[in-house]
Amino acid sequence: MYSNSKAGEQWGYIPPPGDVGDKFMSIEPLSWGRGSTPQGAGLQTETSGTPGGQQWSAPARSANLESIRAALTTDDSLGVVITGGRGVGKSSLARAAVADLGPDTWSLQLRSGPSGANTPYGCLSFLLARLPQAYMGSPTAILRGITSLIRSDAAGRPCVITLDTSGSIDDMSAGVLLNVLLTGTAKIIAVAPKISDLPPDFHWLLTDRRLTEVRLSNLNELQTRQVLLSLLGHRVSASLVATYHHTVGGNPLLLKALVTEQKLSGNLVLSDSVWTLRDKVVLDGAASLDDIVRSRWSRETPETREVIEMLSCARRVELGRLTALYSADVVADMEDAGLLEIDDSDHRWVSLREKYIGEVVRSWLSIARRRELRSGLLGGTEPEPAEMAVDELMAFAAWTHECEAELSPALALAAAEAAVQLFDPHFALSYADMLKRTDREWVPAQRHKAAAYLQLNLPVQALSALDDISQPELDSVGVEEYAHVVAAKAQVMLWLPEQAGKIPALLAAAKERLDAATGHATWPHRAVAAAHRVALSGFEYRAFAGDYADMIPELEAAADPALNPDTSYRMQASVILMSALSMTGREMDALSLMRRIGGQISDASHVVGLREQFTREAFVVLLTAGQWRRCIDLVGQRPDGEPDRMPYRSAASELAAGLAYVFSGRGGAALDPLISAMAQLELQPAQSALRSAYAATALAYAQTGNGTQARKYLGKLQRTPGKASFSAEKIIEFCALVAGRWLGDAEAVAGLKQSAERHMRAGIYTMAGISLLAATVNGSDADFRLLEDIAGHRQGPLAEVSRLIALGSRTKDAKTLLAAGELAATLELDAVEARCMALAVDFARQDGDAVSARTAQARLDILAATVANLPIMPSSGSPLLTARERQIARLAGRGASNRDIALEMGVSVRTVEGHLYQVFTKLGVTSRGDLTGLV
């Protein structure tokens, strides 16, 4: 069947794979005499592996490498075909596969360019040049000569040919390659964009499964991270991975070019052994990416180029509007070619699939061309800000700015607000500065400027922006804007210790003015809505100060739908109530309220910042309730469009994940996200986040037994000034004190007890219980009675764990501590469970309770493998099982005799008997049957 191709007709007869014998061309190496050249001359060979720099994308392609390796080492297989789009790493993968075979394999690289189909023996020309004249007389002789030459060069080693083609290869080369494959002279790794770019005979081989296709696509985000680790050689921040993946769409070639450009520009920096970004990615002037885009640009039609120009400037356009400007066929063809993507929303937004193309093309366009495109899309009318989504506003404002045109005051104000919502403070400041003092939008613009400064951790500048508003200007605005300005000022003053005490007077004055304006009006009257905003600021101030207990009745009234029809006020008050309940010992009530708010939050999507506020407070609620796994899930969620915000939000997400891990006792797992978060926060500080990162990292290192590093970060924490909300400050304090306790600092233990007493007096029972639980690893009876009393004011499984630990430790009851450990295990609090089991071992042995001692010791033995540094060791003198004792115990528990165990482990029977004696003593068992399930 292989004789159907043109290549087959050239040779007259090419047998099927099973019919290769005397009738076929000789595969014996010839003696070339004078016509030969030294081995390797003119050949592109790789016999000693590929330089690591050429295999930078290989770490993300391990599954593909395994498929290729299997195809090249299977007897029936003739090789593999690697297909995929431009830049996905086909050639890199082929080189990595060849290098993986090692020096015992002879490799030969062939290349065929776009014009290769028109040149006989095009990809074999350098082999053809080595043939003696006697073998140049006919295609058959050439085929025989090249086959034997390859066999001779391989010198008895397996041979792999890498055929890298960007287009079709000529029929003569195809025939020779087919002969080489079917005679077993070599196997092949063919690299092509599509199967159709290969000779027809290769299609038959694929159909018969003599060749295996490995189809490559762009990298997913996890693979992008693996490639970045390979390229950069150090940890990489989550924001770096997400931003780069979003920019290049997972294309490895573009990813490498982007890394090179960003390192040269200084935006990609190594901070404390973590690669991260200084600022947003800007591709203007990126030479290597520019070359890649120009190469692709040259192959597109003029109509396609114009659509690309439009989308480069506008970022996205509604499908109906785009097809009104350009041919629908052109748009459809571009979508089929993978240039465009169309979302599923009602607007059917169209954008460039590969964002880097828009960035680069936009940098080519002159101001005049940008204005021409903008005029064509707008048709002489500017859009209304109220009708635009946040992302749409940002795109339009950026386009207008790039055209060096003026934004209308209304659009500049809306863009500043959108930039704050998208955590882009620099753009927010630039848009707010466009407004003049004479514009009626100037006062609200100052609010957004203050919010942007707060995001940059510059509260002094934020307050200055608000203080610039004169009293006459403040008196001239409406009641709602007045309330927003007061709320913004109160928010800024929270972060300035010398100003925080003035907030009650500020809010009281605002309430007096609004009460006069309200009269007997009810919501939705503007004055009532304004009064609600000021009341909300009062709750925020009290929550920031930790005054939770006293304001719960007021919050419950504000959060009651029957009493409060104002959705915005009600939902935000509910979020504060959720935190207040959590801190005052009503953890289960807080979790119930959290679920209810989570189900209603979509109905309040118009409330700016509500989702972020809810996520932040829900994290603390879950953390203090011991639900650390749900904390990880919460911060791991990323809504659509998140990559645009990642430089400002990734650090917070990684910090939150690290905090969840250290609260669970998993210091080792916490270090990666915490170190990454610190690297970003040291470049872009965000309020109290850097102090939180230092404290959590110190605790993580202490939990893993690395006292030197723990003390280093405790020192950094002490040298870093700052102010935080009550909940954040208490988490920082808790992490620092517990780190000190792990390091054996008696003052840290005393600090935890004092903190617990202060919290208890203030009604903050949750933090009191958590602090005292950490302080009483070696507590007194009085400590345990207090811990038990505090647990009685709390709700939920973590409170019950505290109560059982206190009761079991005070009464020295092993069974109570076993119950506490089992409950801690349901929360996956390994360090707390280990504490329970260590105490249970001691108390059970003191009481002669062999069953409880055996159960606790077995569980402690398992935990020793996961808890790097146990919080407490049994004091009864019996250490944990050694690795060899554990191995012998497992074998004995499975029924193996002492002699069988000795033979398997290569030791004497006497040694086995001695180890088993130690195992029985430590675990309190008397027979081998008791070992089953314990070890």
In which residue ranges do the predicted regions lie?
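Helix-loop-helix "sensor" segment of P-loop NTPases
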Residues: 74, 132-137, 152-155, 187, ...
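N-terminal pre-P-loop "Q-motif" helix
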Residues: 54-69
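Internal alpha-solenoid helical repeat scaffolds
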Residues: 103, 198-200, 205-207, 236, ...
